[in-house]
């Protein structure tokens, strides 16, 4: 473990891939070239995390083909129309029994509970270790245990605890991903247009989900084991690319900013948008170099309400992530049931909507300078979208896809905004006094708390859908979306008050972010 600890920046070696590119070029890479490499490598890295994570939701119907269709038409109709060969084989023990849906829900919650638990420690370690190596180890470990879950197919393994342990270990290694990629991107990009840049970059979540869905659905015809092994191999390969090319920070590779930001364009009232993470040269005191503690990070104004909001936002988002293909395949659309592969492909519309929603939320929050108003508005608007999808999604494929797209846009928009731009804002809060070692910890706290909700949602869905109906599940999701918006009420009020103050020419303008942060000290 000691070998992973960061030494002085100037003593760290450049990644081998960077040295190779510079040898080919014959000179040092420009700062903008490094930024492009960071965006591409971290985008691919986290997309591969989500591709591996998405597999379970696609394979659910193959493992548990005899699950109750929760109040719709009988299973006989389902198996006589569009039933896949995998379904006809009777599923896979122990998931094809009467409690199969519950067992799959327990697998999901085990993965997400360990993921959430590991997230808190991942952020703490990420602020103290070489992020390139830390991220690489996480990706290789994720690929290994994702693949071992699939090996159960060829090994004829039917032990529930084998699959449970593989998912838990995969979740532990997956927790290394998000704090690491956000911290690295934060090292290279300043606050200007952060919401838009990170909104576009955050498309890796939906791109990974879409890719994982398509790969897993395509592999089902060859055996469900391949649906796990192929994404597992992909994330290992990308992990090696990450090790070879990822520059953790400008100081690590000796890069110098090749453009000077106009201070007048960076200033908002009396507030100046400083770089997302200050370099070590900007923080000369030991206090500024000290990594922020867990409790200290929780006390940063705004962290608690946004973290709790994300708890409910991810509860909704991850219920769709893990159960949407299963729900679609168990719902008669135009009177017919879809195959597992078709249902998996159709479910990608939720993630396509998520890409659009993430970009929209980032752009809107940049334009109006109000993160909380944007996030809360999206969450409130998602409530009628959820209602209409449940009520009219069965009418036709077009209606299902359109409403799924709209729901994904409204649910994933605030999720993307909070986990990227908001986390970066709070990780550089003025109360930190320039401390550059807080972003991974703050990101881990916010996303870790959200991941607890991500574990609760799929678990409740498994129990509710097997004992009640999908209408009850959607009622739960609408309630969660309402609470998510409600938790931001105080921040929204502060932002609205700031906007009113800004509209008065006699009053001195202040940064909306600073105003909100000053008025949530007690939250």
UniProtKB/Swiss-Prot annotation:
Membrane topology: Multi-pass membrane protein
Keyword tags: Membrane, Sugar transport, Transmembrane, Transmembrane helix, Transport
Xref: Gene3D superfamilies: MFS general substrate transporter like domains
Membrane-spanning ranges: 29-49, 102-122, 133-153, 163-183, 196-216, 228-248, 306-326, 344-364, 368-388, 402-422, 444-464, 468-488
Location(s), subcellular: Membrane
Molecular function terms, GO-annotated: transmembrane transporter activity
Cross-referenced InterPro entries: MFS (IPR011701), MFS_dom (IPR020846), MFS_trans_sf (IPR036259), Sugar_P_transporter (IPR000849)
SUPFAM superfamilies in UniProt: MFS general substrate transporter
Recorded family membership: Belongs to the major facilitator superfamily. Organophosphate:Pi antiporter (OPA) (TC 2.A.1.4) family.
GO cellular component: membrane
Major localization class: membrane
GO-annotated biological processes: phosphate ion homeostasis
Induction (record text): By inorganic phosphate (Pi) starvation.
Name of this protein: Putative glycerol-3-phosphate transporter 1
